[in-house]
Amino acid sequence: MKFVIGPDVAMWLAEQRAQVPAQHKLLAPTLLRSQVLAWCYREVQAGRLARKEADARLNYLRALKIRLLGDRVLQHSAWSLAEQLGWPDTFVAEYLALTTLQAHAFVTRDEQLAQEIGLLVRVVPPEDLLR
């Protein structure tokens, strides 16, 4: 199956050094790279994560097979979805758009987001990636 993962799930996978079964294909918008880098930086600056651990998590994510996409069709779709949903920006909409265009489900740990988009796309918990 093809799953779109957001930064919350990427960091969850990295924290656990999880082994995603080969039959699962992971996808994300290209902005995922910047989001996980910013997340690690914030955690280190706040003293909640050691720099060495942040580097280990980033290295894990760099090695994880995630197909990163960011073409104009995705951007156009994200714009339309953000507008339709009344969102203030297109960041989350890129994940939603990618799910509608290329994946079977969106994976998130955010229950509020899952409820909000659950009528538009299939949403699954991160544990589904490990099965």
Predicted ranges, named:
Residues 12-13, 35, 77, 115-116:
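Phosphate- and divalent-cation-binding pockets in alpha/beta enzyme and binding domains
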Residues 67-112:
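Active-site neighborhoods of divalent-metal-dependent phosphate/nucleic-acid chemistry enzymes
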Residues 1-2, 23-26, 66, 100-105:
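Short active-site oxyanion
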Residues 35-40, 57-60, 77-78:
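A general alpha-helix detector
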Residues 29, 33, 96-131:
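Acidic, PIN/NYN-like endoribonuclease modules and their adjacent C-terminal/linker elements
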Residues 47-71, 75:
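Short hydrophobic interaction/assembly module
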Residues 1-33, 43-55, 130:
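Short, well-structured N-terminal submotif of metal-dependent ribonuclease cores
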Residues 14-15, 40, 117-118:
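Short, flexible helix/strand-to-coil boundary loops that buttress conserved ligand/catalytic motifs
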